């Protein structure tokens, strides 16, 4: 259902809509509207309608949206109607914190593997049933990976090398927390998360607002 013409900010907002709809569903609320979604997320109702229009018709004017139906359709658009197996690559403080984040399994992202290079960590247990393995084991894997997504939390000076190992091993997507731009080909999708860039964006907004 996705189109390459859909802007990335739209996809990110869809994930926000999905989370809000799940909250409504858990509260037993059957109907909502673009105005209600917009008010909850501090955006314009016209933006909500525009974002949804990329993927077809979802509601009727004056009637609104069926919460359950819209939630399921957005899940399908985002690919989160099924479980995604995830590996933590780099089991430092950040990697451990992410692995224990309760929202992951709630939204069908299941940690199934963990890799590091620190000999002191190898074979220790990250989560029940998930021992930490050495990254070199990925080089020796001849069979299909047991995960599709890698969360990369390694130092920037080794991030590209580790990403290359993951790509050659057959990973489909990398969520990269290293503060470096990774080079890749069309075999893998890379999403970068950079806290410093987000903080700089925040400081710009603060300066613009108060100076």
UniProtKB/Swiss-Prot annotation:
InterPro entries: CoA-bd, NAD(P)-bd_dom_sf, Rex_DNA-bd_C_dom, Tscrpt_rep_Rex, WH-like_DNA-bd_sf, WH_DNA-bd_sf. Residues 16-55 bind DNA. Its main location: cytoplasm. It is found in: Cytoplasm. Disulfide bonds: none annotated. GO terms for biological process: negative regulation of DNA-templated transcription; response to redox state. SMART domains: CoA_binding. NAD(+) binds at residues 90-95. One of its GO terms (molecular function) is DNA binding. One of its GO terms (cellular component) is cytoplasm. Keywords: Cytoplasm, DNA-binding, NAD, Repressor, Transcription, Transcription regulation. Belongs to the transcriptional regulatory Rex family. Homodimer. Modulates transcription in response to changes in cellular NADH/NAD(+) redox state. This is Redox-sensing transcriptional repressor Rex. It comes from Petrotoga mobilis (strain DSM 10674 / SJ95). The lineage of its organism: Bacteria, Thermotogati, Thermotogota, Thermotogae, Petrotogales. The gene is rex.
